[in-house]
Amino acid sequence: MAEVSFGIELLPDDKPTKIAHLIKVAEDNGFEYAWICDHYNNYSYMGVLTLAAVITSKIKLGPGITNPYTRHPLITASNIATLDWISGGRAIIGMGPGDKATFDKMGLPFPCKIPIWNPEAEDEVGPATAIREVKEVIYQYLEGGPVEYEGKYVKTGTADVNARSIQGSDIPFYMGAQGPIMLKTAGEIADGVLVNASNPKDFEVAVPKIEEGAKEAGRSLDEIDVAAYTCFSIDKDEDKAIEATKIVVAFIVMGSPDVVLERHGIDTEKAEQIAEAIGKGDFGTAIGLVDEDMIEAFSIAGDPDTVVDKIEELLKAGVTQVVVGSPIGPDKEKAIELVGQEVIPHFKE
């Protein structure tokens, strides 16, 4: 059986103490990674992860995911160094291009091609280059500085560094990637790739692109942790698990390009109807339009036996980490415990 680790993704939209508690529950149930979303409208990932670091001892902790635009890379580096120190060397970094819904509210274009951290630049810069440069700045910082960088997207002065992390430049860097350029770049520069997908068909497309980038950088695919950032829902009652996932699946359908919908045989007209309903705030109609094909394509949902079967198919497609993402289950804490009791042990035998 292929080796696999388990992570959990949590949206910090509830009390920080509650989210930190769920991370502790995840650690107690065999999860190895905790990823916290980074959006302006929720609690700070840094605050939540700091709380979690104090009450946990093994689970790795990091933003899942942040972006190169809404926070200066030196500030991100300081946050990560601080988290690594507080957690005793358990920090990880997840970084991607951001998301349209958040950027619209912040007045940023998506995809963002503005060289925000280099005011002298005149040319547009794509997300892959932005992430590559921001990573280089962050790791200069984590090596102890001083940081001095001039690229297409980022330009700094000579920045001295007082903060010291425990892992230094060995802190793992994960890149959120979907399209071919981002996947290939992740294969070149990242320790892991966070792919927003729950179905083997998507990894049959993604993994070769990751491997292509790895080979060009003189690396092996075996060096890269391929993480399925899933829409996940588990309950002993399979119908309840599926029902809980429908609103999340509706949003995934709305945001999926036609090429992805066609890959899974999804009716594009129905997808447009879902997008229209969500746009009007009519979530009941959107949920009602979610069908079995959409659930199958965009989620891992069901009872423990069903979930195990679906994860086994992901492993065959090259996945090495399964991230249990929203909604997790009808009851988050019970779902985390159920994964720990009846899913993770199956893959650790």
UniProtKB/Swiss-Prot annotation:
Keywords: Cytoplasm, Methanogenesis, One-carbon metabolism, Oxidoreductase. Pfam families: Bac_luciferase. GO terms for molecular function: coenzyme F420-dependent N5,N10-methenyltetrahydromethanopterin reductase activity; oxidoreductase activity, acting on paired donors, with incorporation or reduction of molecular oxygen. InterPro entries: F420-G6PD/mer (IPR050564), Luciferase-like_dom (IPR011251), Luciferase-like_sf (IPR036661), MeH4methanopterin_reductase (IPR019946). GO terms for cellular component: cytoplasm. It is an enzyme of class 1 (oxidoreductase). It catalyses: 5-methyl-5,6,7,8-tetrahydromethanopterin + oxidized coenzyme F420-(gamma-L-Glu)(n) + H(+) = 5,10-methylenetetrahydromethanopterin + reduced coenzyme F420-(gamma-L-Glu)(n). It comes from the Archaea. Catalyzes the reversible reduction of methylene-H(4)MPT to methyl-H(4)MPT. Homotetramer composed of two loosely associated dimers. HAMAP family: F420_mer (MF_01091). This is 5,10-methylenetetrahydromethanopterin reductase. It comes from Methanopyrus kandleri (strain AV19 / DSM 6324 / JCM 9639 / NBRC 100938).
